């Protein structure tokens, strides 16, 4: 494992306006720190429990979907459907979690493959160009995520927490950068989350066994020269 550091005061300054108005606060994150949702007793006397409903875009394939006006919106719709399925089918023992999910409709769209994308484009990780691309990628995602929340609020109704204050948002929380250590393997061994690739050659230990993983973009470069 590896440690993650989170500044809870910064988190609470950035929570949705309707949660600030409701007097809700974030007291802790999940282990990997991408989930920062309010917990504890709310104004209705109910106990809130954070619920993770996540998906991650493969940024290594960014050029294939960056101009698609439906792609991000479709993923957000998928997350909304998953949340509804959980609310409707979770056992009674999960009543606090289903209550929180129903009121907040918090989801988290993240990414993986950022370093792989930079390597594919021959962009040094510590460079001005990587900063430019990083800003462009996440601004593009955020713009489409925000629009999707408003569109779904018009179509399906705003989440109750937002509706209480006349705010048209389907989701309270919209984005979350998860480590994606496992699903990045499924997606062709792309780099996990927004983290750099650990090494150009290393042993990957999984339940299926141990495997040598080599940097595919370095291999292509070595083959070329």
Language-model features, listed with the residues they occupy:
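Long, C-terminal-biased catalytic regions of enzyme "large/alpha" subunits
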Residues: 2-225
């Amino acid at each position: 494992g590896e440690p993650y550091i989170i500044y809870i005061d910064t988190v609470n300054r950035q929570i949705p306006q309707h949660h600030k108005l409701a007097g809700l606060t974030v007291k802790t994150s999940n282990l990997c720190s991408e989930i920062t949702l309010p917990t504890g007793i709310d104004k209705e006397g109910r106990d809130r429990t954070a619920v993770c409903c996540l998906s991650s875009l493969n940024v290594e394939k960014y050029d294939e979907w960056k101009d698609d006006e439906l792609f991000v919106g479709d993923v957000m719709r998928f997350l909304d459907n998953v949340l509804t399925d959980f609310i409707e089918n979770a056992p009674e023992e999960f009543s606090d979690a289903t209550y929180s999910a129903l009121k907040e409709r918090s989801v988290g769209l993240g990414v993986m493959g950022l370093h792989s994308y930079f390597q594919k484009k021959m962009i040094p990780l510590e460079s001005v160009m990587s900063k430019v691309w990083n800003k462009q990628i996440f601004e593009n995602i955020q713009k489409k995520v925000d629009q999707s929340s408003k569109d779904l609020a018009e179509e399906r109704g705003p989440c109750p927490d937002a509706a209480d204050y006349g705010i048209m948002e389907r989701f309270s929380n919209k984005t979350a950068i998860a480590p994606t250590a496992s699903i990045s393997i499924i997606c062709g061994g792309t780099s996990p989350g927004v983290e750099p690739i650990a090494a150009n050659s290393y042993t990957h230990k999984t339940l299926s066994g141990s495997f040598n993983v080599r940097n595919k973009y370095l291999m292509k470069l070595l083959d070329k020269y």
